Amino acid sequence: MTERAETISSFLTAHGWGAAARTPLAGDASARRYLRLARGDERAILMDSPNPAEDVVPFIAIANILHRLGLSAPEIKAAQPDDGLLLLEDFGDGTFTRLIAQGTDPAELYRLAVDALAVIHRDFRPDQASTINLPRYDADLFIEQVMLLADVYVPAALGRAATAA
C-alpha cells in the first residue's frame, strides 16, 4: 500500500468509512480525484487533493459561505486539510445534463441557477471571504480559464486537440 493510500485509509477509518465500498467518480479539471463511498444505505464522497496547489481550505470556506447564504453546498463531514482530504455529503448524480436527458425542463434548472447567483450577488459580502486566498478574477485569469476550454475540454469532448479554426 502506498503512503497516500495509507493516509486515505486511516482518514476513512477514523471517520467510520474504512470498510466502505469505493467507486471512482469522474473528476474535474484539477488534480483532485473523487470516490463515492457506500456503507449500507449511506453514501459520502471522498475528495482526494494530494497536490499542494489544490488546497482544500478555500473549498471549505466557500462551502461555509454558501451555507450561510442559504444555498446548497456539500456538508463537510470530516476534513484533514494538511493531507488534502475531505469527506463530503453525496448530492448524487443529478447533473444538469443527466436531469435534462431524463426530461427535466432546462428552463427550471437554469432558473434555479440564476436564483442562486442572484442570492450570491445580493447577499455576499467580500469581508466574508477575507481569509480565502482566491485569485482576483481579472482579464488575465479569464483568458487562462478560457484556454482550459481548448486545452482540456475540447480534447476530452472531441477526442482531438483544438485547432485555430
Residue ranges and their predicted role:
Residues 1-17:
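Juxta-kinase regulatory segment immediately upstream of eukaryotic protein kinase catalytic domains
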Residues 1, 23-24, 48, 52:
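Short, N-terminal intrinsically disordered low-complexity segments that are rich in Pro/Gly
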Residues 17-35:
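ATP-binding glycine-rich phosphate-binding loop
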Residues 2, 28, 57:
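Conserved phosphate-coordination/catalytic loops
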Residues 35-144, 148, 154-158:
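ATP-binding pocket architecture of kinase catalytic cores
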Residues 9-13, 21-24, 63-65, 74:
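Intrinsically disordered, low-complexity segments enriched in polar/charged residues with Gly/Pro
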Residues 160-165:
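Central P-loop NTPase core of STAND/AAA+ ATPases
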Residues 4-8, 30-33, 120:
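Membrane-targeting and insertion segments and their boundary/processing signals
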